[in-house]
């Protein structure tokens, strides 16, 4: 079983935690190609491309210009968005990190897919950014074939050949479903609000992180055991779930 997460905009590079080893991104060369393109953008151009404030555009201009010499950090440590904050890194041991390395994949606009111990540099490049290359109009077109093929090849080596989608729709769209050889289970967290079941964005993000932490700590590699998850009071609802979606409610 593999699970996918979305990369985060919030990044922290410090020495608060250590990992058992560091690996290079699978698509390092492709990421460097995109950085070469981005280094040609001015601050104003980046402000428009990334749809960010002037200060953030200036920050990321400096990041891209110094990309090759910048500090690096394992992706699982560097990302600190709402999902990644739920990973209890202070409790992780060597086996936890190595299990995550084998079972967790992070979808990234710059790197395609990352393993948790792949080292990354500071950057900002969301998946829906309309960065054009010679043969592609956007990042989806640039990455979808590469990422889909790689995930297919990786799952071929797993006993439980299932992809657990804990990423946002924006990022999971990178996978071409029609060319994916294995079942994809999307996980949804819903709760009753005003008589209707609704997904609450910030709580759903937190829940995706907590489920990921639970999977890593308990070394879950059997998709049928996912039904036992009960974080934040959620429980699996068989009547709302189907062959493509696992729904947890409270």
UniProtKB/Swiss-Prot annotation:
Q: Which GO terms describe its biological process?
A: response to hydroperoxide
Cellular component GO terms held in the UniProt record:
cytosol
Q: Extract the InterPro entries matched here.
A: YaaA (IPR005583)
Q: Which domain of life is it from?
A: Bacteria
The family annotation for this protein states: Belongs to the UPF0246 family.
Q: What is this protein called?
A: UPF0246 protein cce_3295
């Amino acid at each position: 079983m593999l699970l996918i997460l979305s990369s985060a905009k919030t990044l922290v590079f410090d020495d608060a935690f250590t990992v058992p080893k560091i690996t290079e991104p699978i698509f390092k060369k492709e990421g460097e190609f995109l950085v070469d393109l981005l280094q040609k953008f001015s601050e104003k151009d980046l402000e428009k491309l990334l749809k960010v404030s002037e200060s953030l555009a200036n920050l990321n201009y400096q990041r891209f210009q110094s990309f090759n010499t910048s500090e690096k950090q394992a992706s699982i440590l560097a990302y600190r968005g709402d999902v990644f904050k739920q990973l209890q890194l202070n409790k992780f041991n060597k086996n936890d990190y190595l299990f995550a390395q084998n079972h967790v994949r992070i979808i990234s606009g710059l790197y395609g897919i990352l393993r948790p111990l792949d080292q990354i540099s500071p950057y900002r490049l969301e998946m829906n950014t309309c960065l054009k290359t010679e043969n592609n109009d956007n990042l989806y077109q640039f990455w979808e074939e590469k990422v889909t093929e790689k995930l297919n090849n990786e799952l071929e080596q797993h006993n439980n050949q299932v992809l657990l989608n804990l990423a946002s729709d924006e990022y999971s769209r990178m996978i071409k479903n029609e060319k994916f050889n294995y079942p994809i289970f999307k996980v949804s967290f819903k709760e009753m609000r005003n008589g209707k079941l609704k997904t609450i964005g910030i709580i759903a993000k937190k829940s995706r992180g907590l489920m990921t932490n639970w999977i890593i700590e308990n070394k879950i590699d059997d998709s049928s055991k996912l039904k036992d998850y009960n974080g934040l009071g959620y429980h699996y609802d068989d009547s709302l779930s189907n062959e493509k979606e696992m729904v947890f409610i409270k």
